[in-house]
Design a protein with these regions (language model features):
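Short charge-dense sequence patches
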Residues: 60-74, 85-91, 148-151, 164-173
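Core segments of small alpha/beta cavity-forming domains
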Residues: 86-163
C-alpha cells in the first residue's frame, strides 16, 4: 500500500485555511477548517503513474492500482489559485434516479462515470451532515463487507476530527452548516466492468460564525455489487491532490471539470 496513509483533518491545517479568513475567534474555529490530509506536507512534485502490476496470469494487482501515487501538492493549494487559461476537459457524470440505502441517492449506471457519481453522493451525504452516527450508517450500507473498517474510513475520521476539535458532540450544532459540492473528478484505474478507482474533488464550505472554504480530493475503489456501486477499498487509497478547481495545477493533477448529464 502507499506510504502516505490518510489521516483525519488536522487542527494544524485549519490555521492555514483560516489565515486569510478571520483571526477573531480562531480558537473556536480551529475545529472548523477542512484539513488536507497530514501526509500532504511534502514539496509539490509530479508523479508519473506506473503501469499496473500484472502478476502471472495477467491479473491486475488492484492494491497497486489503489495505492498508485498521485500528484502531491501543498496544503495551500486547496485554498485558492489563479484560473487556468484553458479549462480542463469535462467528465460527464450521470444523474441519480432514486434514493438508496441510508438515504443516499443512487441509480447510477454500471460505468466508471456512474461510480464517480455514486462516490460523490456518498461523500456529500457524510460530510454535509457531519454526524458520527449517520456516517456509521452510511458505512454499513455502502462499504463492501470486509473492506475498510468504519473506524478507518477516511470520511468517518474526518467527521470525528471536525466535531471533536469544534467542541461538538456527535453531530453539527444548531447554526453550523457544511456544504459539499463536487467540482471535478477523475477515473484513476479500471479492472473490468465491475471494479474501478475513482476520485472526486469537492468544494467544501463550513459556516460557524464565519465561513471557511477549501477544496478536498478523495479517492476510493468502487465495486459493482447487487446492482449498485459500493466502496471496496481494502485499505488506504493514495492521497488525492486537493487543488483549487479550475487551476492549471488541478489540470496537471488529472482533474476533469464536473459536468452533470443533461445540463
Amino acid at each position: 500500500m502507499a506510504g502516505d496513509q490518510p489521516q483525519a483533518w488536522s487542527r494544524r491545517r485549519l490555521w492555514v485555511l483560516l489565515a486569510g479568513v478571520c483571526v477573531v475567534g480562531l480558537a473556536l474555529l480551529v475545529g472548523l477548517g477542512f484539513a488536507i490530509r497530514t501526509a500532504v506536507v511534502h514539496a509539490t512534485r509530479t508523479i508519473t503513474p506506473a503501469a499496473a502490476t500484472r502478476p502471472a496470469g495477467g491479473r491486475v494487482d488492484r492494491d497497486v492500482l489503489l495505492a498508485e501515487p498521485m500528484l502531491q501538492v501543498a496544503p495551500a493549494d486547496a485554498l485558492g489559485g489563479a484560473p487556468a487559461v484553458e479549462p480542463a476537459a469535462a467528465l460527464t457524470v450521470p444523474n441519480s434516479t432514486r434514493t438508496g440505502p441510508a438515504r443516499v441517492v443512487t441509480g447510477f449506471p454500471r460505468t466508471p462515470e456512474g461510480a464517480v457519481g455514486q462516490l460523490a453522493a456518498i461523500e456529500q451525504t457524510v460530510l454535509s451532515e457531519m454526524d458520527v452516527a449517520r456516517a456509521g450508517e452510511v458505512h454499513r450500507a455502502w462499504v463492501v463487507p470486509g473492506a475498510v473498517p468504519v473506524d478507518q474510513w477516511p470520511l468517518v475520521r474526518h467527521v470525528q476530527s471536525f466535531l471533536g476539535s469544534a467542541g461538538m458532540t456527535g453531530r453539527l450544532e444548531a447554526g453550523a452548516r457544511v456544504t459539499v459540492d463536487p467540482v471535478a473528478a477523475q477515473v484513476k484505474a479500471t479492472d473490468g466492468p465491475d471494479w474501478v478507482v475513482v476520485c472526486v474533488l469537492v468544494d467544501v464550505r463550513a459556516l460557524v460564525r464565519v465561513e471557511s472554504r477549501m477544496a478536498y480530493g478523495y479517492c476510493e475503489a468502487m465495486a459493482w455489487r447487487g446492482g449498485r456501486w459500493m466502496v471496496a477499498s481494502p485499505g488506504a487509497a493514495a492521497v488525492a491532490p486537493s487543488t483549487w478547481p479550475g487551476t492549471e495545477l488541478a489540470a496537471r493533477a488529472g482533474w476533469r471539470t464536473w459536468h452533470v448529464a443533461g445540463e
